């Protein structure tokens, strides 16, 4: 019995020791080798006149060539036409239910009897504005673009003035439009960067108008035509935006895709074929999504600091950014971002809400990659007479101490 008890105790002790032996921690997941290497060059389209990849969130051009060179926009012009229509609709100047007439001028200049793309609406046929716009966007109808321009502004020339005004407003600095459809015309020019700015603006400002770009085919009367953006069939993350082709412009494509929370915009101008512009755009999208990511660093209106305020009713003021601060970074390098705030050492009331008080800067490996003004998130009124007097004495005393310390 004693032997059996001793054996039991020994086994129990051994079992306890075994149970208490710590389990080895799993090996740390190795970082991808590519996280520590330079980003490979973007797959530059070999035969394009100009191209780029833009991060939608920040507007940063991640890669490109000849991005500011003048190019013929061809039918990508119709994105500008869509923007103008959406803006005028938002302002109450036109409605989606307006009946738009396919005038004889629109039909003869851009209809089925021409060599260009057409919507299929018959001469003198009326259709709701939104349907005419889909005929322009999906089928790239030159006739629909003219009819819409006539409805919104009275003539193509007047509509072109609106196009140029809105282009300037959204930051297109090197573009000039003379027609709503993009057929070759003297002085009708843009750049790859400006087109990306335009695409980004349409997606951001008028998502419903942008949504027409993902329609794969449209039927008008007896005619069904496909969207010429081949990426709509090849990549489910692609949801727009517009193709273009003339003999002068070559084959062009502005595309946009969203994967997770990240969206990119690509522009390929002056390519050699319908298929090649799609292949090149797909390669650029894949490269951008693989090697870059977008981050929202700070929300608009969220306090980032509360510096001291002298001579005010309040002794502090909350500061933050007025619009979200976004940044594009190479994948795997987000943790290496370093933020700093530049604020005056002394703030005095009164301070107005929204008043710029300083800057927030974000650096990656010592290079500034994003910055934004720091503004007051609330107003601070002047304090009473005695508080202002007291704070003046304290400030004088603080300055005196600082000067004395400097002398020592």
Q: What is each PLM-predicted segment?
A:
Residues 3-5, 79, 259:
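Hydrophobic alpha-helical segments, especially transmembrane helices
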Residues 10, 20-30, 321-335:
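Short, compositionally biased leader-like segments
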Residues 172-176, 184-408:
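Domain-terminus/edge residues, biased toward the C-terminal soluble/receptor-binding domains
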Residues 1-5, 404-407:
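Short, low-complexity, intrinsically disordered N-terminal peptides in bacterial proteins
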Residues 20-193, 200-206, 218-221:
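Active-site-adjacent loops and short helices of periplasmic peptidoglycan-processing enzymes
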Residues 3-18:
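Gram-negative bacterial Sec-dependent N-terminal signal peptides
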Residues 19-45, 382, 386-389, 393, ...:
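Compositionally biased, proline/threonine/alanine/serine-rich low-complexity intrinsically disordered stretches
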């Amino acid at each position: 019995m004693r032997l059996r008890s001793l054996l039991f105790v020994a086994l129990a002790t051994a079992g306890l020791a075994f149970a208490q032996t710590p389990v080895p921690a799993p090996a740390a997941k190795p970082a991808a080798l590519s996280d520590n290497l330079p980003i490979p060059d973007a797959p530059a389209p070999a035969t394009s006149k100009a191209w780029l990849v833009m991060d939608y969130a920040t507007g940063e051009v991640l890669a490109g060539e000849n991005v500011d060179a003048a190019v013929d926009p061809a039918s990508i012009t119709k994105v500008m036409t869509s923007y103008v229509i959406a803006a005028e609709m938002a302002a109450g100047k036109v409605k989606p239910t307006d009946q738009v007439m396919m005038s004889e001028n629109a039909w003869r200049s851009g209809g089925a009897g021409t060599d260009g793309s057409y919507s299929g609406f018959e001469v003198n046929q009326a259709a709701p504005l939104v349907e005419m716009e889909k005929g322009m966007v999906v089928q790239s109808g030159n006739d629909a673009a003219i009819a819409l321009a006539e409805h919104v502004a009275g003539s193509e020339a007047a509509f072109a003035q609106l196009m140029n005004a809105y282009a300037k407003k959204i930051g297109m600095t090197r573009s000039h439009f003379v027609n709503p459809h993009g057929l070759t015309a003297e002085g009708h020019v843009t750049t790859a960067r400006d087109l990306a700015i335009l695409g980004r603006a349409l997606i951001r400002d008028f998502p419903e108008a942008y949504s027409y770009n993902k329609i794969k085919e449209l039927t008008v009367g007896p005619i069904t035509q496909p969207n010429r953006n081949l990426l709509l069939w090849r990549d489910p993350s692609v949801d727009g935006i517009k193709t273009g082709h003339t003999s002068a412009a070559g084959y062009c494509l502005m595309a946009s895709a969203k994967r997770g929370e990240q969206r990119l915009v690509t522009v390929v101008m002056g390519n050699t074929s319908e298929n090649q512009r799609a292949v090149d755009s797909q390669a650029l999208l894949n490269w951008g999504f693989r090697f870059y990511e977008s981050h929202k660093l700070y929300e608009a209106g969220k306090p980032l600091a509360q510096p001291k305020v002298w001579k005010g009713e309040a002794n502090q003021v909350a500061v933050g950014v007025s619009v979200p601060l976004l940044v594009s970074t190479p994948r795997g390098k987000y943790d290496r971002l370093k933020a700093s705030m530049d604020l005056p050492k002394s703030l005095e009331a009164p301070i107005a809400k929204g008043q710029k008080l300083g800057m927030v800067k974000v650096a990656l490996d010592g290079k500034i990659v994003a910055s934004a003004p720091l503004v007051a998130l609330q107003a601070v009124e002047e304090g009473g007479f005695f508080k202002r007097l007291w704070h003046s004495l304290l400030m004088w005393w603080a300055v005196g101490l600082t000067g004395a310390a400097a002398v020592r």
